[in-house]
Design a protein with these regions (language model features):
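C-terminal, well-structured catalytic/ligand-binding subdomain of enzymes
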Residues: 2, 6-174
Length: 174
């Protein structure tokens, strides 16, 4: 199982220089590592000792007007407590979030990867059948979001679909 991601969250050169890898040994749960930056609480990319990986990609959201669970806390909880994809899905499903995100979850135990798609009003899981590849950019792919107007707009108006197609092209070449 090979999981890759580009870290294209860019807010200036100084920010780009200050990445760090944290090794966390919590009092409860599974030790994990996280690729982050100083001051960040939670996880945007990481892997736990049981072989669960998480990476997040932002989807199209409306401006949040209420506080709920930050997505980086959800992904941290997945790394700290999940040993399988089903456990990761259960953790994500029990949390209410205030933004839309795709959480790519890989599992050494399951020898598989899925995309958990969360938003304030919906939840979906994208599984690829009969394929060794799953691609995740900045739009949702599960049946739960098939008719979602915000997601359809994201596909048409953003660079997400282009990035998805480019990923397919590059992996086909190599």
């Amino acid at each position: 199982l090979l999981i890759g991601r580009n870290f294209d969250f860019y807010v200036g050169d100084e920010f780009a220089k200050n990445k760090l890898v944290e090794f966390i040994e919590p009092e409860n749960g599974i030790p994990y590592l996280s690729v982050s930056w100083p001051g960040m609480i939670g996880v945007v990319s990481g892997m736990n000792k049981e072989g669960i990986t998480v990476t997040i990609n932002a989807g199209k959201s409306k401006i949040p007007l209420t506080a709920k669970t930050p997505i980086s806390f959800v992904t941290r909880e997945i790394l700290q407590y999940a040993t399988t994809i089903d456990e990761a899905i259960a953790i994500a499903k029990k949390r209410k979030v205030f933004v839309s995100e795709s959480i790519l979850v890989g599992s050494a135990n399951d020898k598989n990867a899925v995309i958990i798609e969360v938003s304030p009003d919906n939840f979906g899981v994208y599984r690829v059948e009969n394929s060794s590849k799953v691609f995740c950019t900045n739009h949702f792919q599960s049946e739960a979001y098939k008719n979602d107007k915000r997601n359809q707009k994201q596909i048409v108006e953003s660079h997400s679909e282009y990035r998805y197609e480019k990923l397919q092209e590059l992996l086909q070449e190599n």
